[in-house]
Amino acid sequence: MTEKIGVLGKKTTQRTDVERIVVTPLPTVYGKFRAFGYFDHERGDEQVALVHGDLGAEDVLTRLHSECLTGDAFGSQHCECGAQLASALRQVADAGSGIVVYLRGHEGRGIGLLAKLRAMALQAEGLDTVEANLALGLPVDARDYGVAARILDDLGVRSVRLMSNNPRKREALVRHGIRVAEQVPLLIPPCESNITYLRTKRERLDHHLPHLDAAMAHVSS
């Protein structure tokens, strides 16, 4: 490992497995961001972190967003991923500073795009998202957040306010040395197309979704 003065003006630790390649301005509909591009030499993935404003080291508003082509790009209502990404970018911009780490290689909770589509086909036949993965002989959740922790480390971030409903993300960051000062809910109103999926995330994957009961009553009425 070597130390360097990063683009943000902080001394950061450069780890050889995740290398910062480029920084560029990225104006968006939510506000002005900077895109920090990284290459993960261990996995061969290209990664990006969108940074808004001037970051401190502590309690940085942060979203770790697993890539979801169907939700983020196509507006799929099978999940709430696209709406969560938009909400996270908006909240970071409104807060004046923060980070959205967009995690490539996390498609379908880490099983890949084609496997995810196969799992979605099984869900259309009546299996839930957990049962579908297992029926395909795949892990329920294969995501690793080590690269996210190394990106935060490169940006000089030691603790975060984590926008997530998933306790496993918090646990993973803590294991990798990033303190989670607060877990900030990122709740999206469900629709008829994703209510079963969200219920499974709550009941089988331990996601914190306190708004779901009232929403389920509304959807079924």
Curated annotation (Swiss-Prot):
NCBIfam families: PRK00393.1 (NF001591), ribA (TIGR00505)
Cofactor note: Binds 1 zinc ion per subunit.
Hydrolase found in the keyword field: yes
Species of the source: Streptomyces coelicolor (strain ATCC BAA-471 / A3(2) / M145)
Cofactor section: Zn(2+)
High-level lineage: Bacteria, Bacillati, Actinomycetota, Actinomycetes, Kitasatosporales
Protein name: GTP cyclohydrolase-2
EC number, UniProt record: 3.5.4.25
Binding site for GTP: R63, L64, H65, S66, E67, Q84, E107, G108, R109, T129, S164, K169
InterPro entries associated with the record: GTP_cyclohydro_II, RibA, RibA-like_sf
GO cellular component: cytosol
UniProt record similarity statement: Belongs to the GTP cyclohydrolase II family.
Molecular functions (GO terms): GTP binding; GTP cyclohydrolase II activity; zinc ion binding
